[in-house]
């Protein structure tokens, strides 16, 4: 019975969020901003977008710009 409680506690700590984004299951099923940018025909640049393109958002976590023509 102690083994069951131990496993239950370990699972609780494994899947709980100690702080924002620290949980293991938080990113499952989500697409990254960079992936969404590229899928929508954009590209990521660390500098500002060229004049013939439009800013669509960011490509986190580094936060470069997502530009699209």
UniProtKB/Swiss-Prot annotation:
Residues of the signal peptide: 1-21
Cysteines paired by S-S bonds: 37-66, 44-59, 49-67
Biological process per Gene Ontology, one example term: response to testosterone
Spans through the membrane: none
GO cellular component, one term: microvesicle
Residues making up the propeptide: 22-32
Keyword Transit peptide: no
Tissue: Highly expressed in kidney.
Keyword Secreted: yes
Molecular function terms, GO-annotated: CCR6 chemokine receptor binding; identical protein binding
Keywords attached to this entry: Antibiotic, Antimicrobial, Defensin, Disulfide bond, Membrane, Secreted, Signal
Entry's localization field: Secreted; Membrane
Primary location class: secreted
Family: Belongs to the beta-defensin family.
Function as written in the Swiss-Prot or TrEMBL entry: Has bactericidal activity. May act as a ligand for C-C chemokine receptor CCR6. Positively regulates the sperm motility and bactericidal activity in a CCR6-dependent manner. Binds to CCR6 and triggers Ca2+ mobilization in the sperm which is important for its motility.
Oligomeric and partner information: Monomer. Homodimer.
Protein name, UniProt field: Beta-defensin 1
Originating organism: Rattus norvegicus
Native organism taxonomy: Eukaryota, Metazoa, Chordata, Craniata, Vertebrata
Gene that this sequence comes from: Defb1
């Amino acid at each position: 019975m102690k083994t069951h409680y131990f496993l239950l506690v370990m699972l609780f700590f494994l899947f709980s969020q100690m702080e924002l984004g620290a949980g293991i299951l938080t990113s499952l099923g989500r697409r990254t901003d960079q992936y969404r940018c590229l899928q929508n025909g954009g590209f990521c640049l660390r500098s500002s977008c060229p004049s013939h393109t439009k800013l669509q958002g960011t490509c986190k976590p580094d936060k470069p710009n997502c530009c699209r023509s």
